[in-house]
Each structure stands twice: as C-alpha cells, then as structure tokens.
Amino acid sequence: MNHKRKLVTLIVFALLLSVTSIETGFAKPKKKKEALTGTPIMWERPNDIASRDLYLGPGGAAMRPYLRGLTFIKEEKGGWSKKYRVRDGAGREWVAKIGKEAQSETSAVRLLYGLGYLTEINYLVPRVTIPGKGTFTNVRFEARPEGWKRAGEWKWKSNPFAGTQELQGLKILMALINNWDLKDSNNVILKLRGNRGDELRYVISDLGATFGHASTTPILWRLTRSRNNPVNYAKSNFFEKVKGDRVVLHFGGKNRGLMKDISIHDAQWVGSLLSQLSDRQLRDAFRAANYSTGQIDLLVGEVRERTNELLSLRPAVQIGRN
C-alpha cells in the first residue's frame, strides 16, 4: 500500500509541475509602459505679460463652465480635498474641488500663467449645486478637455528641464507662493496636439497648499502649516540670505533640497517677469478666486514685496583671505 501511495503522490506531483510549466510558458507578457512622444514644454516665453487676463486665466472666456444642467459623474479619489467629476450643460467634464484649497489654487494657476508657465485650466465658482451632493461655496472647476491625455506624473529631480532657468524659476515661484506640498504626485504630464504637433506639457496639477505658511522647524512643521490663509502668508518670510552668488530662501515645505543651488541670476529673472504684472493684474488673479478686498490687499502687497526682494538681490561680498 505504501508503494502505491508513493507512486500516486509522484504522479500527482508530476502533473502539477507540468500544468504550472504550461501556464508559465503561455502567460501573457506584461504590457510595456507606453513611451511618451512629443515636445516637452514647461514654460513659453510670453510677449504679452502686461496684457494677460489674470481674471479669466489660461482658459479665457471660451472655456468657462456652463453651469446649467450640471450632472454628477463620480467622486474623484486622492488628495486632501473632496473632489467630484461633473459634466456641465455644454457636455464638458470638470473636476470640482471643494474646500479650503479651491481659492488658493485658482489664484496660483493665474500667477503662473501670467509668467508663461503652462498650467491646468480652472475657474472658481462662488456657489454651485452638484446634483445629489449638495450646494457648496467657492468651488474650483478644473477642466478635463477632450484630447488631453493625463500621461502620468513628472519628477522634480528627474525631468527634461534639469538645470534650465524655467525649472529653477518654477522652484523659486513655489517658495514665493509658499507651496509647501512639493511632491511628484502633485505633478502631471499633459499630452495633447498643439500648434507644433504633439506636446508634453509639464504642469503642477495641485497648487492648493499655497498662500499660507509652513515652519522651517521640523518639530513644528505639521503643527503650524496652513493653506489659503492670507494673514499667515503676509506674516511669513521668503528670503533668508545670500551666500556668494546663491540665494537661501525661507522654505518650510516638502522636498526642501529643491531650494538648494538657487542662483541670484535665476531669482532676478523671476523677479523681472513678476515686475511686468500690474497691480490690477495681480488683483484680478486673487479676485478670480473670490477673495475679499482686504485679503486681496494683503496678498498683492506680499507678492509685490517678494518681487522687490528678488530684484534687489546682489552677490555677497566676502572680505578677507580665501
């Protein structure tokens, strides 16, 4: 009996091995990640900074959501804020962001757009009813245009713009607007057909954690950080010191290492772009987000002050022997 049992066990084992080998041999190969083709773009030299409409932003009047006949599609997962995918009366899809980040993100997009950076298209709706979900105030509507493929995130430390002025400038702007949530998952590559063929637009998709404050002291970082808080923003620091021809910025956000090796030349370049925006344009960028007059005064004043700090930077003079 023992001999027969051993024989049966060996046969079963052999059959299992053969089935496993067949399945392995015919297993479908893993789908390779599609290589992105197109021209990478982060910033386009603007010839019209002084005349850009920072109230309507990158989408202009033509892209504004048509709120009659709004329908709910689904809840969007991920991120700090509640978000709903909706369709407007014109059949266009949007992601509606609810909560504190809506205002700050709307203004941040307009500020970047004003300087030539590529951005999402968004608008702030002061009050809207989303069927089945409720009525909300200050809701950011972010466009999901047909033909625009969201082709994954891009990395701050590994991208086609390493060492370029536009990438360094973007870092400086993130410190200027106090964006303390600098992480790769907040970035997106938008693939679309543009005037020059296929474009790969490198965009910061989530700019909600801006115009607030974050401490540079690690133990206080989570306790004191804020977003969309004009008073905190106006009280926070931007510039710390100059070391040789490098600028040390006061930045208490994630990925602080990104703020190392910022040159005076790059900082002045950002300042020169910002200085071309009029007070009216800056006010429009914040008015578009439904800030009060007092809040707009605070925010515009602080952006102006930080712009002047960038423009006034000079190399540190070292006295004594090397």
Report each predicted region and the residues it spans.
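Extracytoplasmic/secreted envelope proteins and their assembly/folding machinery
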Residues: K83, E105, V109, L170-L173, ...
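C-terminal catalytic region of ATP-dependent kinase domains
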Residues: G194-N322
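Solvent-exposed, acidic/flexible segments
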Residues: I98-E105, A162-G169, L176, W180, ...
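Residue-level detector of family-conserved "landmark" positions at structurally sensitive sites
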Residues: N122-Y123, N187, I296
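Conserved kinase catalytic-core segment
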Residues: S104, R110, G152-R225
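Conserved ATP-binding subdomain of kinase catalytic cores across diverse folds
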Residues: P58-K157
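Regulatory N- and C-terminal appendages and interdomain linkers associated
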Residues: L7-F72, D88-G91, D279-N322
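N-terminal secretory signal peptides that target proteins for export/translocation
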Residues: M1-K4
